[in-house]
A protein has these predicted regions:
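Short, conserved charged micro-motifs
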Residues: 433-438, 480-483
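Solvent-exposed beta-strand sheet faces enriched in polar/charged residues
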Residues: 184, 460, 511-513
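Short, well-ordered beta-strand segments in beta-rich or mixed alpha/beta enzyme
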Residues: 363, 422-428, 458-487
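Intrinsic disorder in cytosolic terminal tails and internal cytosolic loops
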Residues: 1-15, 390-424, 429, 436-440, ...
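Residue-level signal for well-ordered alpha-helical positions
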Residues: 344, 441, 484-487
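Alpha-helical transmembrane-bundle signature of multi-pass membrane transport and export proteins
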Residues: 1-394
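An amphipathic, aromatic/His-enriched active-site/gating alpha helix that lines ligand/cofactor pockets
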Residues: 395-396, 447-456, 474-510
Length: 519
């Protein structure tokens, strides 16, 4: 199967599904997501009758999401440096092995809570490795104009699974037992692995000269740290997910303790969330208020029909926020750091859920279920009201395409790729009347340098030269600087540099300084 479509289909919400490779993998991911939600329902339902149930049930979500918090950035670095297809296939095999063990021990009635949480954590490790690699693959499968639709379809896959998986799991738990639910989840990993084996990319996933793992890890962290747009996206995700995690963490207890429902009824509640999520819009503030209102309904209304009805708009709100911030990240991140940037987003998302679930479970144990849900609902409403204060930034006019425009450096000596650190100086001449504007314009250039590899950056006046300015920045190695030359820069970086250089006069002089103690 070819990974590159011959032509871009008409732009529509469903256009990516007309591409055979995307459709095949999307259906496989849907099957895997259905299995994952069945697994969650089964694991939580095994614990609802245990002592300390509020904490144990909430810990299922923590065990699932904590690996993403711990491993997201390393997983993103792996996805940016290794063959993504092979990485995904290997991870699915690992997940299937864990699933077989989980199924066998549950069927043998040898599944104490500690072991269940340990194996749930192991499944979370696999998901942590899968998420950034899969998210980074999506832009390779569809034309750029279909990326928003493809991202939305990815979210729809999750929420279709959230609608179907819990309902099926509820029936299976009641009729066949939890072990059968775990077996179905294990089979879903095999389905995804099979689809990946059938996919044959036109070109290798990894770069021609892969980055070293530690260098890639540091480069990803620098990019996120020095990108205001990415930091704002992460802030909005965190402000929603932390209070929002209360619903997912405490819903099993609402079902069993307040509504008197069995596993089938709990599945229906989760299905109502999923149905609403499939039909979401793009209104962040309204979404937050709606979700907060649903948490208050769960706290105050012990009527199953009303709670089920309230969960549908909550699903809409959840999907609204997730699809909005996820698409914003995918559209903004350049290809060279996409998996690492998305992994940080997943880290914030998973960390918010894992730590939030732990906090809401502890509060539920100390103050009661109603108090925990009411506090979470109020916190969500406050977070929603911050949208006008810290909105997502409009990046529709920002050119994110790669731009190779720096001239190749010509050195009088041979520099080893790992030689470093390397100091780069750029000398400018700026007329007095333009100097204030030049200094301001160079702030954007400095952010660009840091995003693409510079550890330090500064702009200085040349004391011995009238109207002279010297830009100085340090990169970890010669290899890292060559990567700046060879594909890390985007059209937006080029535009920022051109705005600054338009304020200068005469030639610009560039020098590369290498360590004196290295040959």
């Amino acid at each position: 199967v070819s990974a590159t479509p011959p032509s871009a289909p008409p732009a529509s919400a469903w256009a990516p599904l007309r591409l055979a490779v995307f459709r095949s993998l999307w259906l496989a991911v849907l099957a895997s997501n259905v299995g994952t939600w069945m697994q969650t329902v089964g694991a939580q339902w095994l614990l609802v009758e245990q002592p300390n149930a509020p904490t144990l049930v909430a810990l299922v979500q923590t065990a699932s999401m904590l690996p993403v918090l711990l491993l997201a950035l390393p997983a993103g670095a792996l996805a940016d440096t290794l063959d993504r297809r092979r990485l995904l296939i290997g991870v699915q095999c690992f997940l299937a092995a864990v699933g077989v063990l989980l199924t066998a021990l549950t069927a043998a009635d040898r599944m104490p809570p500690a072991l269940l949480l340990t194996l749930t954590f192991a499944l979370g490790v696999g998901q942590a490795l899968t998420l950034p690699a899969w998210q980074a693959v999506i832009p390779e499968l569809v034309p750029r104009e279909q990326l928003v639709s493809a991202s939305a379809l990815g979210s729809i896959s999750v929420n279709l699974a959230r609608s179907v998986g819990p309902a099926v799991a509820g029936v299976l738990v009641a009729q066949a037992g939890v072990a059968v639910v775990f077996a179905v989840n294990t089979a879903s990993f095999a389905i995804f692995a099979g689809a990946l084996l059938r996919w044959r990319p036109d070109r290798p996933d990894g770069p021609a000269m892969p980055e070293r793992f530690t260098a890639a890890l540091r480069a990803g962290g620098r990019y996120v740290r020095h990108s205001p747009v990415v930091r704002r996206i992460l802030l909005r995700a965190a402000l929603f997910v932390v209070p929002g995690s209360a619903l997912w963490a405490l819903l099993p207890l609402v079902a069993s303790q307040r509504l008197g429902l069995g596993p089938g009824g709990y599945g229906v509640l989760l299905a109502a969330l999923g149905v609403g999520a499939v039909a979401a819009s793009q209104l962040l503030l309204v979404a937050g208020l709606v979700y907060g209102g649903t948490l208050l309904v769960l706290a105050l209304v012990p009527v199953p029909a009303l709670v089920t009805a309230a969960l549908v708009p909550a699903g809409v709100a959840w999907m609204t926020v997730l699809s909005t911030v996820n698409a914003a990240m995918q559209l903004f991140l350049p290809g060279w750091v996409r998996a690492r940037g998305l992994s940080v987003y997943q880290m914030v998302f998973a960390g918010g859920q894992a730590l939030g679930a732990l906090a809401w479970g502890a509060l539920g144990e100390l103050a009661g279920l109603v108090a925990a849900l009411a506090v979470a609902g109020a916190a969500m409403a406050v977070a929603a009201l911050t949208v006008p204060l810290w909105p997502l930034r409009d990046t529709r006019g920002v050119d994110r395409d790669p731009a190779v425009y720096w001239p190749e450096p010509h050195l009088m000596l041979d520099a080893h790729p790992r030689t470093g650190p390397v100091l780069v100086t750029v000398s400018y001449t700026v007329p007095p009347e333009r100097q204030d504007a030049f200094v301001e314009a160079m702030r954007a250039v400095g952010r660009s340098r840091r995003r693409t590899g510079a550890m330090r950056w500064g702009l200085f006046r040349a004391g011995e030269r009238a109207h002279g300015f010297v830009e100085v920045y340090q990169v970890p190695s010669w290899e890292e600087h060559l990567r700046q030359h060879g594909g890390r820069l985007t059209g937006a970086d080029r535009a920022a540099e051109e705005r600054a250089r338009a304020l200068t006069e005469g030639d610009v002089h560039v020098a590369h300084l290498l360590p004196a103690d290295e040959p």
